[in-house]
From Swiss-Prot:
The lineage of its organism: Bacteria, Pseudomonadati, Pseudomonadota, Gammaproteobacteria, Enterobacterales. SUPFAM superfamilies: LexA/Signal peptidase (SSF51306). Gene3D superfamilies: Umud Fragment, subunit A. Keywords: Autocatalytic cleavage, DNA damage, DNA repair, Hydrolase, Protease, Serine protease, SOS mutagenesis, SOS response. One of its GO terms (cellular component) is cytosol. Involved in UV protection and mutation. Poorly processive, error-prone DNA polymerase involved in translesion repair. Essential for induced (or SOS) mutagenesis. Able to replicate DNA across DNA lesions (thymine photodimers and abasic sites, called translesion synthesis) in the presence of activated RecA; efficiency is maximal in the presence of the beta sliding-clamp and clamp-loading complex of DNA polymerase III plus single-stranded binding protein (SSB). RecA and to a lesser extent the beta clamp-complex may target Pol V to replication complexes stalled at DNA template lesions. This is Protein UmuD. Its EC number is 3.4.21.-. It comes from Escherichia coli (strain K12).
Amino acid sequence: MLFIKPADLREIVTFPLFSDLVQCGFPSPAADYVEQRIDLNQLLIQHPSATYFVKASGDSMIDGGISDGDLLIVDSAITASHGDIVIAAVDGEFTVKKLQLRPTVQLIPMNSAYSPITISSEDTLDVFGVVIHVVKAMR
């Protein structure tokens, strides 16, 4: 698994943010096209020194919106809770899964073709962070 830390930024780059929502159906002819500026670092990264990026591999999380090749933004400053998507290692093997803490501790794939990973008292589970955003390439 390749972990990528964000580089120190020399300059903040902002991008246009249009105030209207984009209709997935028929667009409104009365749309207002006022724009603002948005800093993607400010939007996507809450804890810069504890945030890293990792590329997803495989299809075990496809029903959770994570596809092969997606870039995951992971915050290691957040304490993982029941239901969070996490980067974890079970006995040294890395995976991205949904964390279940009750009634038993399990790492749940979000694809019915895969089985949950039950964590027993003999297993070592290390959680390396919570996935907070997924960056998808559309082409």
